[in-house]
């Protein structure tokens, strides 16, 4: 009999504890009642009720894949004017990054020599001179890019903003493309 009374009392305790636990949690009061929002529903009349982006379909076209390869930051914009280029370079200098110029005759990564791109597959670009440590003039970077273009007219040229404290590349954008 002792066993059955113990079971009965534990069941009774569980039955009594369940409502107490549910009432211990306070209701969430961060949201407003749904009755405060007006609801207007149109009757369902077939396919006309399906969601549609309507006239915005023309905005969702992707870039053509032939002849318009894209690179890093800013490559989806038109070619930068000299003023825009100076502003971008001033931005990276203002952030304390070291400007560095790189060029490549390939411009695009390929997998001709191995399953993964390597040195001879356009993965690595050649540095033009040394990084411009201590450079505070954006015009000097543009002048170096023009000099690189004069030396290698068929090359892609990019500017890199290098953080020499964290030792990472922070920004990279194309400044010259071959004609």
Swiss-Prot record:
Task: Return any one Pfam family short name.
Answer: RbcS
Locations listed in the record: Plastid, Chloroplast
How is this protein annotated for GO cellular component? Answer: chloroplast
Q: Where is the transit peptide?
A: 1-58
Give a yes or no for keyword Acetylation in this entry: no
Tell me the SMART domains matching this sequence.
Answer: RuBisCO_small
- Asked if the record carries the keyword Chloroplast, the reply is yes
Keyword annotations for this protein, in alphabetical order, are: Calvin cycle, Carbon dioxide fixation, Chloroplast, Photorespiration, Photosynthesis, Plastid, Transit peptide
UniProt main location, coarse: plastid
Q: Which Gene3D superfamilies match?
A: Ribulose bisphosphate carboxylase, small subunit
- UniProt function note: RuBisCO catalyzes two reactions: the carboxylation of D-ribulose 1,5-bisphosphate, the primary event in carbon dioxide fixation, as well as the oxidative fragmentation of the pentose substrate. Both reactions occur simultaneously and in competition at the same active site. Although the small subunit is not catalytic it is essential for maximal activity.
What family, per the record? Belongs to the RuBisCO small chain family.
Leftover remarks: The basic functional RuBisCO is composed of a large chain homodimer in a 'head-to-tail' conformation. In form I RuBisCO this homodimer is arranged in a barrel-like tetramer with the small subunits forming a tetrameric 'cap' on each end of the 'barrel'.
Quaternary assembly:
Heterohexadecamer of 8 large and 8 small subunits.
Q: What is this protein called?
A: Ribulose bisphosphate carboxylase small subunit, chloroplastic 1/4
Source species of the chain:
Fritillaria agrestis (Stinkbells)
Q: What's the gene?
A: RBCS1
């Amino acid at each position: 009999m002792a066993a059955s009374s113990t079971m009965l009392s534990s069941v009774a305790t569980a039955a009594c504890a369940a409502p107490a636990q549910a009432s211990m949690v306070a209701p969430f009061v961060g949201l407003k009642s749904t009755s405060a929002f007006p609801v207007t529903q149109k009757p369902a009349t077939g396919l006309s009720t399906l969601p549609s982006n309507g006239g915005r379909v023309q905005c969702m076209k992707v870039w053509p894949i032939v002849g318009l390869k894209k690179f890093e930051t800013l490559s989806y914009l038109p070619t930068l004017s000299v003023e825009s280029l100076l502003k971008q370079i001033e931005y990276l200098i203002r952030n304390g990054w070291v400007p560095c110029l790189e060029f490549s005759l390939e411009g695009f990564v390929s997998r001709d020599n191995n399953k993964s791109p390597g040195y001879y597959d356009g993965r690595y670009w050649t540095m033009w001179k040394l990084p411009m440590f201590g450079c505070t003039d954006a015009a000097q970077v543009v002048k170096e890019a023009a000099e690189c273009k004069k030396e290698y007219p068929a090359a892609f040229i990019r500017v890199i903003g290098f953080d020499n404290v964290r030792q990472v590349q922070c920004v990279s954008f194309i400044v010259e493309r071959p004609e």
